[in-house]
């Protein structure tokens, strides 16, 4: 009764040893022998042993950088066993290696549900896969479809929204199409100030400043930014944003005032460089050549990583 499973295990152990020695031919010989023995009369013990064989084969295929082969072995496992943590981990590795980001994302969600990772590690992995999933979109319509496949909690993550807007820009979408994605992010940032860390605020402001300059001047946005600036006077990035939008509205004096206050205090290099560059352009507009040269020099001195 126990002989076939024991013989199969012996071959699997020998195959594992051959794999460790990088002897693919010997590994294949022992594995093939195990598969032949597994074709006998079915039993619960035999099924479990063959599941182990499939999992081992999937792991070896991944080691050989053959993700498609690994997925074929995993697909041969019964559904109950396929949902076990080890099988899901192997499927996650295989789908990531095979650049099947949507399937990898679904698998990572299952692993998170099963508690296979810490909360922090699971969220980081899922965020990475969400962004890869969005990167697979090659036009705005595909991006909207990919976005709709995300879970609500994933769509609410500021870094995911920002990644989606940046992807839209890369796909050549007009700025008017990008603004509806940024507006809720802005509203949450100013209505729930604890929802965004300073580094995230800097990224949101940078993306907003770029996008707002590509749409017609909007008085409502100007008023909203000015209210936020007055509500959070210590958020220097809002002075920068106000200055950039005032410049877009041809409010030269106020733009200069805001940017001159913000530029020396900004900690984010890209924001600071843009502030100095815009001040240089304002000085050139007023034909203040010497002042413009000073600002251009300061912009050049900012090192952007």
Protein language model features and the residues they cover:
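Membrane-proximal soluble helical/coiled-coil segments
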Residues: 1-78, 82-84
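Residue at a conserved register position within TPR or TPR-like alpha-solenoid repeats
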Residues: 11, 18, 61, 95, ...
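Structural motif corresponding to the intra-repeat A-B loop/turn of tetratricopeptide repeats
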Residues: 21, 64, 98, 136-137, ...
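Alpha-helical repeat scaffolds
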Residues: 26-37, 66-78, 101-114, 138-153, ...
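Structural register within alpha-helical repeat arrays
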Residues: 7, 14, 57, 91, ...
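Flexible helix-coil transition and linker loops at the boundaries of alpha-helical arrays
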Residues: 2-5, 38-48, 115-120, 148-155, ...
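Start-of-helix register in tetratricopeptide repeats
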Residues: 5, 9, 45-52, 86, ...
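Alpha-helical adaptor scaffolds
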Residues: 46, 50-63, 194-268
């Amino acid at each position: 009764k126990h002989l076939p499973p024991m013989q199969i295990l012996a071959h699997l152990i020998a195959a594992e040893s051959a794999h460790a020695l990088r002897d693919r031919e010997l590994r294949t010989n022992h594995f093939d022998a195990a598969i032949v023995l597994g074709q006998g009369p079915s039993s619960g013990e035999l099924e479990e042993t063959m599941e182990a064989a499939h999992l081992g084969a999937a792991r070896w295929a991944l080691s050989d950088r053959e993700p498609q082969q690994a997925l074929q072995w995993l697909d041969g496992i019964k559904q109950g066993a396929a949902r076990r943590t080890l099988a899901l981990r192997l499927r996650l590795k295989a789908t990531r290696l095979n650049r099947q980001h949507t399937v990898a994302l679904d698998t990572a969600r299952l692993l998170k549900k099963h508690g296979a990772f810490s909360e922090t590690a699971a969220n980081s992995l899922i965020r990475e896969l969400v962004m890869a999933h969005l990167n697979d979109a090659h036009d705005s319509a595909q991006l909207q479809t990919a976005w709709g496949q995300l879970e609500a909690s994933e769509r609410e993550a500021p870094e995911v929204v920002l990644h989606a807007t940046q992807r839209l820009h890369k796909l050549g979408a007009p700025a008017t199409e990008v603004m509806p994605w940024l507006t809720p992010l802005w509203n949450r940032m100013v209505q729930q100030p604890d929802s965004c860390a300073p580094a995230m605020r800097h990224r949101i402001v940078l993306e907003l400043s770029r996008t707002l300059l590509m749409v017609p001047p909007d008085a409502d946005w100007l008023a909203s930014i000015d209210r936020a600036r007055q509500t959070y006077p210590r958020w220097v990035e809002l002075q920068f944003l106000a200055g950039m939008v005032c410049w877009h509205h041809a409010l030269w004096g106020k733009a200069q005032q805001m940017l001159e206050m913000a530029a020396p205090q900004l900690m984010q290099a890209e924001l600071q460089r843009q502030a100095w560059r815009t001040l240089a352009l304002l000085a050139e507009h007023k034909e203040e050549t010497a002042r413009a040269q000073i600002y251009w020099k300061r912009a050049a001195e900012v090192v952007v990583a």
